[in-house]
Amino acid sequence: HLLSRRQRQMCIRDSEYTKDSKVETSSIVVEPYTSKILAIIGGKDYASSQFNRATQANRQIGSTIKPLLYYLALENGFTPATTFLCEPTTFKLDDNSTYSPSNFNDKYAYKDVTLAQAIAVSDNIFAVKTHLFLGTDNLASLIKKFGIKDVKTNASLALGTLNTNIYNLANMYNCLASEGKYNHLYTIEKITNDAGKVLY
């Protein structure tokens, strides 16, 4: 496949620049609608490390969670023009604790911003306000539908404090790319015997 071949070429090229570096990366390319995995890369050199970072390395996913949050918002009456005030904010939570997230580089609009603007600049204040408005259980429940079990229901979930791997992240994003159609990602289409009979 042209795309997966191009991806492999890019990884080989990049590895030439980082031969002496210990930095690793991973990547998955998925075909929307079919959920077919076209390419998966778990590291730059299988000979030196068989650890598959695409499926085994769990990390906080950060702002990549926001499209899922805003999908929920749109499903619950928000529009791209829905606004919240963007300014430094301390949130008082149900357990009487407080939470004070910040925007990247402490940059704030100090005025109402729209959902469309918020996702364009990855505004954290807007994300947390949206998350708390919807109820923290909603985002956690959506994530669990993708088979991710250990999801903490808290305010910071809106900013991607979820620990998971890019296989699971690709699984979630593929559902969005497939217009809501959800199928598990797969690498094997079928298995045949030497007579061509389909065994799987």
Predicted regions and their residues:
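A short, well-structured edge-of-sheet supersecondary motif
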Residues: 18-47, 142-144, 189-193
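Short active-site loop at a secondary-structure junction
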Residues: 20-25, 48-68, 81-87, 156
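Second-shell loop/turn segments in exported
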Residues: 15-16, 25, 51-59, 101-106, ...
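Conserved catalytic neighborhood of penicillin-recognizing serine enzymes
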Residues: 78-139, 182, 194-200
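Short, charged, amphipathic alpha-helices and their helix-cap/turn boundaries
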Residues: 134-150
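Active-site-proximal helix/loop microenvironment
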Residues: 146-199
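Active-site SXXK
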Residues: 35, 58-86, 118, 172-176
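Single conserved hydrophobic/aromatic residue that forms the stacking wall/gate
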Residues: 1-12
